[in-house]
Amino acid sequence: MSEFWYTKATMNKLNPDYIRFEHFSPTHLFVTAIFIAIIAAAMIFYHKLDEKGRQKFLYIMSALLIADELWKHILSAATGQWEWEFVPLHLCSINIFVCVINSFKRDKLTSEILYALCVPGAALALLMPTWPNLPFLNFMSIHSNSVHVLLLMSPRLLLAGGFRPDFRRLPKVLAIVLCECVPVFFLNKVLDTNFFFLNGTAGNPVLKILASIFGKDFYFIGFIPLLAVVWFFMYFPWYLAKKKKAKTSV
């Protein structure tokens, strides 16, 4: 079987020493720059569309996300490599469904979830990917890159369309995440999976730092202060912009 069809687990077994690129290497930064350019171009294009065009664009985004997820399941199953880890219960995978719901409703809560969770989650995945042992021309590598680009793009499109984040909706977002974490935590124990990164650091440098601070069994406690810092930088500029707008309108 060609390496194009290997999953990460298969590559680890057959070629454990293979590394396509190191984090923040020239290759990694070049590919990331291409992804940023694609997202920026999509935002500009979306901003210029009328309301009907924007709705169609979001439908297309949802269709691409679903197709991307199905591509992973169909090809991994067809090659006998499907595993429970592929169930769409990772934080980014769950946001695929949030994107689909948002494309039909475009309500403030799902938009906030996408901004608060999808942006940092997908950005971290692209900046510090957990699949550097897969070749670029590999179906799982293509899926991992494309799905995270689409997930990062979705909330950026909402911003280009006029959505403005509001930190006052964050308690609801956090409550939803915590409610999801409880069943996922126990499901990880039953299936030996790592949904929400609650059952291991998966080689992620950020999670390794948390493990060094809080211990390998309690690293996930560090998610709370880490998320608080990330949200501060994500929301404070919008808060200042809103205050400035309120002053100028008086």
Predicted segments, located by residue:
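Hydrophobic core of alpha-helical transmembrane segments in multi-pass integral membrane proteins
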Residues: 29-47, 65-70, 181-185, 224-237
